[in-house]
Design a protein with these regions (language model features):
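Bacterial N-terminal signal peptides that target proteins for export
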Residues: 1-9
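Bacterial N-terminal signal peptides
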Residues: 9-19
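Boundary at the C-terminal end of the N-terminal hydrophobic targeting segment
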Residues: 24-28
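C-terminal partner/receptor-binding element of secreted or periplasmic proteins
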Residues: 32-33, 124-125, 131-157
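Disulfide-bonded cysteine motifs in exported proteins
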Residues: 35, 45-47
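Mature extracytoplasmic domains of secretory-pathway proteins
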Residues: 61-118
Length: 157
């Protein structure tokens, strides 16, 4: 209960929101990986939805459709469900991560549409890829409090 209260207080104060959950461990590879991944609402994407693969999250909220693209091919692409497990001693949210969908590669030429679960304060939808060093990187898909756009932010397991 205390950890949930702390997380709610951090949210209320705007601390840690969209500044990069887990950014204390970020390095140049993680930042480069994140800069090559892109997410936006389907209505804002320049893609033909009929030509895209669609992944539906459990308990999907039909209007919440995101498009994930990348500027390079990423191995071991996953769409993941995120559930807040705890807040670390440093104040970072730590998530349980459950793989919902796996694909050998997220190809730069093949956008994927995700019909997302409804998100509240913390992201409940995410993606995972393997970076150039072979490490798995997990990113939450969050809604910006400023303009309603979608953001990717690395999360901790």
């Amino acid at each position: 209960m205390r950890k949930r209260f702390l997380a709610a207080m951090l949210l209320a104060l705007g601390i840690g929101l969209f500044g990069g959950w887990g950014s204390a461990q970020a390095n140049s590879v993680a930042e480069t990986t994140q800069s090559m991944l892109h997410v936006c609402w389907l209505k804002d994407a320049h893609v033909n939805p009929a030509a895209c693969e669609v992944v539906r999250m459990p308990d999907a909220f039909e209007p919440a459709k995101a498009v994930v693209t990348s500027s390079v091919d990423f191995p071991d692409f996953q769409v993941v469900a995120l559930d807040l497990r705890e807040v670390s001693a440093e104040g970072y949210p730590v998530f349980n991560v459950q793989s919902i969908y796996y694909k050998d590669f997220l190809r730069a030429t093949e956008p994927i549409i995700i019909v997302m679960r409804d998100s509240e304060s913390f992201p409940r939808n995410g993606i995972a890829v393997r970076d150039s060093l072979g490490r798995e990187r997990v990113f939450g898909i969050a809604i910006s409090g400023e303009d309603g756009s979608l953001l990717l932010s690395e999360v901790e397991r």
